[in-house]
């Protein structure tokens, strides 16, 4: 860029030509002042054009630097919102602009929530090698797209299937998972009553079956008394069946 170098050269020339003459030849300047008459405003007339030239050079240099900075600095954009200037220029030249007189910005979406705004977008491309829209009738496209359901991406543990009755299935513990509603019926259901008896999953070492204080028993005073009575009767039967003293031990032996 010749602007700044030219400005520096002019400033250097002015300093070299003005300062040494005033310092080295003071007597010659006094003689010239004595010979020539005093003209008021002559120095100002010489200084003003110099300032104007310098000001013009500075403005030109600033303009060149500003244009260079604008071309050097580029704003970094998001990959999903990046504008393609070449396509805009080509569209302006051809006159093929999108809705609103400009290209529509495509927003980057989540892969599981990506929505096809135009269901025939893949068939609108005439240059595609697969199957252009001109080969397919409208009724075929309508029937084909109506058969394809719009499936929403769900969590693997909460994914619902069409063969299940409930639309949303909650992921459950492996020991409490019920796939079929019939499996939820406990084996304790009575045939005539039709009352569901929920079964609680217990620890294998703490599982109690038939205990008087269990789900089917009562832990009241009557239940405890009955339990104590059963235990006492069991001990009496054991004593009667196995006496400690046999009857032939009591009879004396005959000589």
UniProtKB/Swiss-Prot annotation:
Q: Where is the composition biased (Basic and acidic residues)?
A: 184-202
Identify the Pfam families for this entry: TRH
> In which compartments does the protein localize?
Secreted
What organism is the protein native to? Rattus norvegicus (Rat)
Report a single Gene Ontology molecular function: thyrotropin-releasing hormone activity
Give the record's GO CC terms: extracellular region; secretory granule
- The principal location of this protein is secreted
Residue span of the signal peptide, if any?
1-24
According to UniProt, the name of this protein is Pro-thyrotropin-releasing hormone
Q: Which UniProt keywords apply?
A: Amidation, Cleavage on pair of basic residues, Hormone, Pyrrolidone carboxylic acid, Repeat, Secreted, Signal
Hey, which family's this protein in?
Belongs to the TRH family.
Bias class Polar residues marks the residues at 235-244
Proline amide PTM positions read: 79, 111, 156, 174, 204
Give the highest taxon in the source lineage. Answer: Eukaryota
Region ranges (Disordered):
76-102, 184-214, 235-255
Q: Which residues carry this modification: Pyrrolidone carboxylic acid?
A: 154, 172
Functionally, this protein is described as follows: Functions as a regulator of the biosynthesis of TSH in the anterior pituitary gland and as a neurotransmitter/ neuromodulator in the central and peripheral nervous systems.
**One record GO biological process:** response to ethanol
